[in-house]
Amino acid sequence: MIIIDTGCANLSSVKFAFDRLNIKAEISRDIATIKSADKLLLPGVGTAMAAMKILQDRNLIETIQNATQPMLGICLGMQLMTEYSSEGNVPTLSLMSGHTDLIPNTGLPLPHMGWNKVRYEQDHPLFAGIEQDSHFYFVHSYAVLPNEHTIATSDYGVPFSAALGCKNFYGVQFHPERSGKNGAQLLKNFVENL
């Protein structure tokens, strides 16, 4: 398992989540290491524009786009998997169709921060052993509205994609590394089931 070094603040907490599961995970920005990994994790905290600049500066965009092994994007990492983010009006990785936009104003404060229910497609391997409508921890102001790649949803005034999946690329808007036993189970499922 390689955690792609995106320079974001949650790298250590993501690695520690795998350590707690006794799953060997290494943080790397080395292209050869990333290409040879059996699984990849794309974390992200911050803005889409800053994250894409870091990936470009580290020559990682093409490597990520050409990955054939299972990859899990977390929070901003999931948003980067779509085609475009209105946060900075920046093209993203285009690993799947869709775009990321500011959560519509429904009177609820932004960012959406805290625990929220997640409803997933029945029998999806990413959510194996996790009860329907379980709670996960979110911190975000931008979201991907439900589309053909949505495998789980949550609601914050409007429904949004809590998880996406397309081919070997998966993403979660919530932070599994901060979501207790449900988050730990999801990370374990990613490693063992996908």
UniProtKB/Swiss-Prot annotation:
Q: Where is the Glutamine amidotransferase type-1 domain?
A: 1-194
Q: Which cysteines are joined by disulfide bonds?
A: none
Q: Can you provide one Gene Ontology molecular function annotated for this UniProt record?
A: lyase activity
One GO cellular component term of this record is: cytoplasm
Gene Ontology BP annotations: L-histidine biosynthetic process
**TM helices/strands, residue ranges:** none
InterPro entries linked to this entry: Class_I_gatase-like (IPR029062), GATASE (IPR017926), Imidazole-glycPsynth_HisH (IPR010139)
Query: Which taxonomic lineage does the organism of this UniProt entry have?
Result: Bacteria, Pseudomonadati, Pseudomonadota, Gammaproteobacteria, Pasteurellales
Q: Which residues form a coiled coil?
A: none
Q: What is its EC number?
A: 4.3.2.10, 3.5.1.2
* Name recorded for this polypeptide: Imidazole glycerol phosphate synthase subunit HisH
State the compartments where it is located: Cytoplasm
Source organism per entry reads Mannheimia succiniciproducens (strain KCTC 0769BP / MBEL55E)
